[in-house]
């Protein structure tokens, strides 16, 4: 089990070995670290690597790297965590602070303090708390190889933490140019990318790249979700402006998804804020789904920088209503023009259908109305004639009765064949089809036309009287029997003119 004294001996031995060849490069790399000409040519960068011993302790072996590793101004501490099995990577970054005048060493290398309790030392990045002025630096001078804790601005927190706690490097002070407080702990490839290049801009770069990727994922996911959720109004809005509006919209669809990926860092925000108004101005008008869809990519950068968001919103408010009104008009015009063919076709078809129905109903009512009209005219003619001469109505009625019979308005076939009396019976039945109440009122009008009461078959309209049937079927039989001469004359006069129109 390695103790702290063994580690200090090993570090002293290896530092004395590799100190001569590294002085010039490290002095060139970090000569201006603490302000005004405070350059120590004997400072060196040590890479501290720890291997977890089986008993649970961490054996730290400090070795000075070659010229390529010495040229870099940062090193990494890899500590394997036995509980999770994953290595905890901490960036040991040498920072340049031009505003610190009280630093007495050009290099600030964070060492790993191993607690005595046998547990592992976990070194990771410190979360951004409010104590930006505390900075714990362990420096190494060329003549003195033992470690000395030195506070740079104020009195630092004690370095010895309880067993199992972590020592975290402090973030950049707010006065440094690339300072951006990040609430995300640096882990994985971001710290290795931080360790590749010197300078404080890497912290801001990595801390910007991480919420940028997260916001990019949310942007693409929200855009795809909005596009998948509301395809109807979007399609309607796309087809509402035919011609140049569709490729214009297609070119603005791609920067909404590609601009977060193409432009990194603050340039991405500056570039994303430029197509924001145009995209939102050209897309927000035609439909509420597209307006809601474009409000998500605009509101995502608005959380990061509220001033460009408000400026963009103020910039949007000017072309927004005009475009909205104009495209709403064009959309309403297109919707009216697109719906008027449908409604026009629908109304035209309904008009044609209603015209056909009304024509049929008119023709049907005309077909029924002429029958009842002719029947009423016939009845009126017969009642108006009122003469005992039966020849006049019998000769005038058969052609009209033939037309009624061709329309098949008689309810039963005996009306077609039994000629003398069903003439009057057909008239009354056809008029009773058109208006049922008119036949009983007109039936007394038939009484002057028929001289004898036997021919009044209107009392039973559905079934003619058997006497009238006998008269119609067997005139010869009734000719043998004694019949009054006026009845015989009427039978002959009604039977003979009605037979020619028989089909």
Swiss-Prot record:
Q: Does the keyword RNA-binding apply?
A: no
**Segments of this protein annotated with the region Disordered:** 1-72, 97-462, 483-503
Swapping residue 405 to E leads to an effect described as:
Does not inhibit PRC2/EED-EZH2 complex activity and abolishes ability to decrease H3K27me3 levels
Listed A to Z, the keywords are: Cytoplasm, Nucleus, Phosphoprotein
- Give me the Gene Ontology terms describing cellular component: cytosol; nucleoplasm; nucleus
**Compositional bias per record (Polar residues), positions renumbered to this chain:** 184-197
Q: Spell out which residues are annotated as carrying Phosphoserine.
A: 259
Compositional bias segments (type: Low complexity):
41-72, 345-366, 428-453
Major localization listed first in the record, in broad terms: nucleus
Effect the entry attributes to changing residue 81 to Y? No effect on H3K27me3 levels
User: What GO terms describe the biological role, i.e. biological process, of this protein?
Assistant: chromatin organization; epigenetic regulation of gene expression
Regions of compositional bias (Basic and acidic residues) in chain numbering: 1-16, 97-107
Q: Where in the cell is it found?
A: Nucleus; Cytoplasm
* Lineage: superkingdom: Eukaryota
| Phenotypic consequence of residue 406 to K | Acts as a substrate of the PRC2/EED-EZH2 complex and does not reduce H3K27me3 levels
Q: What tissue expression does the UniProt record report for this protein? A: In testis, detected in male germ cells inside the seminiferous tubules, especially in spermatogonia and round spermatids (at protein level). In the ovary, expressed in primordial follicles and oocytes but not the external follicle cells (at protein level).
Q: Where is this region: Necessary and sufficient for inhibition of PRC2/EED-EZH1 and PRC2/EED-EZH2 complex activity?
A: 403-423
Tell me what effect the entry lists for residue 88 to F: Slightly decreases inhibition of H3K27me3
Name the segments for region: Sufficient for interaction with EZH2: 401-409
State the protein's purpose. Inhibits PRC2/EED-EZH1 and PRC2/EED-EZH2 complex function by inhibiting EZH1/EZH2 methyltransferase activity, thereby causing down-regulation of histone H3 trimethylation on 'Lys-27' (H3K27me3). Probably inhibits methyltransferase activity by limiting the stimulatory effect of cofactors such as AEBP2 and JARID2. Inhibits H3K27me3 deposition during spermatogenesis and oogenesis.
User: What is its quaternary makeup?
Assistant: Interacts with PRC2/EED-EZH1 complex member EZH1 and with PRC2/EED-EZH2 complex member EZH2; the interaction blocks EZH1/EZH2 methyltransferase activity. Interacts (via C-terminus) with SUZ12 which is a member of the PRC2/EED-EZH1 and PRC2/EED-EZH2 complexes.
This protein is called EZH inhibitory protein
Species this protein is from: Homo sapiens
């Amino acid at each position: 089990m390695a103790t702290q004294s063994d580690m200090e001996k090993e570090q002293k031995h290896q530092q004395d070995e590799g100190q001569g060849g590294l002085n010039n490069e490290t002095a060139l790399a970090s000569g201006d670290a603490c302000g005004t000409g405070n350059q120590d040519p004997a400072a060196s960068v040590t890479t501290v690597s720890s291997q977890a011993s089986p008993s649970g302790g961490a054996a730290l072996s400090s070795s000075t790297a070659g010229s390529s590793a010495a040229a870099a101004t940062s090193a990494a501490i890899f500590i394997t965590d036995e509980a999770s099995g994953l290595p905890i990577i901490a960036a040991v970054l040498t920072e340049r602070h031009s505003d610190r005048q009280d630093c007495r060493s050009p290099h600030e290398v964070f060492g790993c303090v191993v607690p005595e309790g046998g547990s592992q030392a976990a070194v990771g990045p410190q979360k951004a708390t409010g104590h930006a002025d505390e900075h714990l630096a362990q420096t190494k001078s060329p003549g003195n190889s033992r470690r000395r804790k030195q506070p740079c601005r104020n009195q630092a927190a004690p370095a010895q933490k309880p067993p199992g706690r972590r020592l975290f490097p402090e973030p950049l002070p707010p006065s440094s140019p690339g300072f951006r407080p990040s609430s995300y702990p640096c882990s994985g490839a971001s710290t290795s990318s931080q360790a590749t290049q010197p300078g404080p801009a890497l912290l801001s770069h990595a801390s910007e790249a991480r919420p940028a990727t997260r916001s990019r994922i949310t942007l693409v996911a929200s855009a795809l979700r909005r596009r998948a959720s509301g395809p109807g109004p979007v399609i309607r809005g796309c087809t509402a402006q035919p011609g140049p509006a569709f490729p214009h919209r297609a070119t603005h669809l791609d920067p909404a998804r590609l601009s977060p990926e193409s432009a990194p860092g603050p340039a991405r925000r500056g570039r994303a804020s430029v197509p924001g108004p145009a995209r939102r101005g050209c897309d927000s008008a035609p439909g509420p789904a597209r307006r809601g869809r474009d409000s998500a990519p605009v509101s995502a950068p608005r959380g990061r920088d509220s001033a460009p968001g408000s400026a963009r919103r103020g910039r949007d408010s000017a072309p927004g209503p005009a475009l909205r009104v104009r495209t709403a008009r064009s959309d309403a015009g297109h919707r009216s023009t697109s719906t008027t063919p449908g409604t026009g076709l629908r109304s035209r078809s309904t008009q044609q259908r209603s015209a056909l129905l009304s024509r049929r109903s008119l023709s049907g009512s005309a077909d029924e109305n002429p029958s009842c009209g002719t029947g009423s005219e016939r009845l009126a003619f017969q009642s108006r004639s009122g003469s005992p001469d039966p020849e006049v109505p019998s000769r005038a009625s058969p052609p009209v009765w033939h037309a009624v019979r061709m329309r098949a308005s008689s309810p039963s076939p005996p009306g077609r064949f039994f000629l003398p009396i069903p003439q009057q019976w057909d008239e009354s039945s056809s008029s009773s089809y058109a208006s049922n109440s008119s036949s009983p009122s007109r039936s007394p009008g038939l009484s002057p036309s028929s001289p004898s009461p036997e021919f009044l078959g209107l009392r039973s309209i559905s079934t003619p009287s058997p006497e009238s049937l006998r008269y119609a079927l067997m005139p010869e039989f009734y000719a043998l029997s004694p019949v009054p001469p006026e009845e015989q004359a009427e039978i002959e006069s009604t039977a003979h003119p009605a037979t020619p129109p028989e089909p």
